[in-house]
Amino acid sequence: MLLLMFALLQDGELRKAEILSIRQRKDGPSFYVHYVDFNKRLDEWIDASRLDLSHEVEWPQPEKPEKKKTGVGNKAPSKNAQKRARADSRDVSATPDLLTGKNVNVGKAQRPSKAGGKENRDGTPLSMPIVTAEAISTDGTPKAESDDVEMVDVSFTDGKSIKEEERALGLMSREEEIERLRTSGSMTQNPTEIHRVRNLNRLQMGKYDIEPWYFSPYPASFSDADIIYIDEFCLSYFDDKRAFERHRTKCTLVHPPGNEIYRDDYISFFEVDGRRQRTWCRNLCLLSKLFLDHKTLYYDVDPFLFYCMCTRDETGCHLVGYFSKEKDSAEGYNLACILTLPQYQRRGFGRLLISFSYELSKREGKLGSPEKPLSDLGLLGYRQYWRETLVEILMEPGRETVSENELALLTSMTEKDVHETLVVLNMLRYYKGNWVIVLTDYVVEQHKKRLEKEKLKGARKIDPARLQWKPPVFTASSRTWNW
């Protein structure tokens, strides 16, 4: 347990905070604090004036000495127990298709391949009618407490419930843990993970000054610099302004070092191979680690493709965001990591990135899903995209009957993502012995409001006709780790 005391947020609110680190500077000591029940992106260095000593301070409790293990519990398992364990392991390792009773490759028509792993579960009938909320009675069907879809950041939920969930994680399997994280928006798989102190104070990238959110393994000497200069084209980093300006006079790169595969009047997409452009991709991963707490890969970039979205002007193509994708994903993921840079957030770029990843899946003829766990902001972005995409299809005139499988084929989403989105929106109901998709009044109203808003502001969408891209084919050596 760390030292707990009350500190003032930047808006003046008093919150309980953990002191993670202390450093001594010329102007006095400063404290690196994590605000309890808040996301780690709000961690910051504060001076002593923002600490409130009028409240009781919670001191760390001394660790209890470990009990010595006796020899009683170290007996070898009996032969019968070993036989039972072997039998259980044989049962578990059986072929999944045989366990579920599915008949594989027997007279099936060709269709886009699905994502692997747990992304495809058969949970609903093949075809379901679409009806309005007034057409059926909801007796016997559990209602949501509110028609609104609550997207709750896990960091703002009750602290007690979080601790109970964390204790329960110890009893979960890895697959169950991943499942919990992808639906909760947690930033890390390990709840006991030690906080990494944010090592950079401020970035200058192009015309923007940016405050980092998390730790990133830049050189240790950078932690003492007041500002870090990052070239917005080649992503090289400097802690000295003179060195940065000298670099800018020599650097000739004006766009990501890859093939431009999409261009419209607003944005461009570049495909960058991590094996061919290792330095640039590593610099990109270092930069994104400042804003993605769950990101662990920043050195071995060979097995990944990076799809970078840029805006254009007379000086060049300015990086807005990107997503990475494994060259050969065993689980069938169509996206490994996604980021919109903070200076471009809340402008609709995240939706364009997600939409573009599904356009690539459609071109490949596959069903895709993002890699788990999703960050809190990533989960919100995907849920919004899934909701809007499915409602658009269901609202098409003349569409009276549709199945989850058909929705997946139309959108390149996995059936699991389709099913979960319908459940979150409270659109699945059991009616007269069948499951039906219900377009609730709230969903229809929100869809109309979004269309009106798009007419006023103008919605930007990916135009599939402008995508000049074929699914790349890689050799075994080019899609493996560079070990």
From Swiss-Prot:
Record domain Tudor-knot: where: 10-53
Keyword annotations from UniProtKB, A to Z: Acetylation, Activator, Chromatin regulator, Chromosome, DNA damage, DNA repair, Nucleus, Transcription, Transcription regulation, Transferase
EC number: 2.3.1.48, 2.3.1.-
CDD domains: NAT_SF
Site (Important for catalytic activity): 337
Superkingdom field: Eukaryota
PTM info: Autoacetylation at Lys-295 is required for proper function.
Annotated segments matching region Disordered: 57-127
Signal peptide positions (record): none
Domain MYST-type HAT: 195-471
Classification via InterPro entries: Acyl_CoA_acyltransferase, Chromo-like_dom_sf, Chromo/chromo_shadow_dom, HAT_MYST-type, MYST_HAT, Tudor-knot, WH-like_DNA-bd_sf, Zf-MYST
MF annotations from Gene Ontology: chromatin binding; histone acetyltransferase activity; histone H3K4 acetyltransferase activity; peptide 2-hydroxyisobutyryltransferase activity; peptide butyryltransferase activity; peptide crotonyltransferase activity; transcription coregulator activity
Entry function: Catalytic component of the NuA4 histone acetyltransferase (HAT) complex which is involved in epigenetic transcriptional activation of selected genes principally by acetylation of nucleosomal histones H4, H3, H2B, H2A and H2A variant H2A.Z. Acetylates histone H4 to form H4K5ac, H4K8ac, H4K12ac and H4K16ac, histone H3 to form H3K14ac, and histone H2A to form H2AK4ac and H2AK7ac. The NuA4 complex is involved in the DNA damage response and is required for chromosome segregation. The NuA4 complex plays a direct role in repair of DNA double-strand breaks (DSBs) through homologous recombination.
Domain notes: The ESA1-RPD3 motif is common to ESA1 and RPD3 and is required for ESA1 histone acetyl-transferase (HAT) activity and RPD3 histone deacetylase (HDAC) activity.
Family: Belongs to the MYST (SAS/MOZ) family.
Protein name: Histone acetyltransferase esa1
Organism: Aspergillus fumigatus (strain ATCC MYA-4609 / CBS 101355 / FGSC A1100 / Af293) (Neosartorya fumigata)
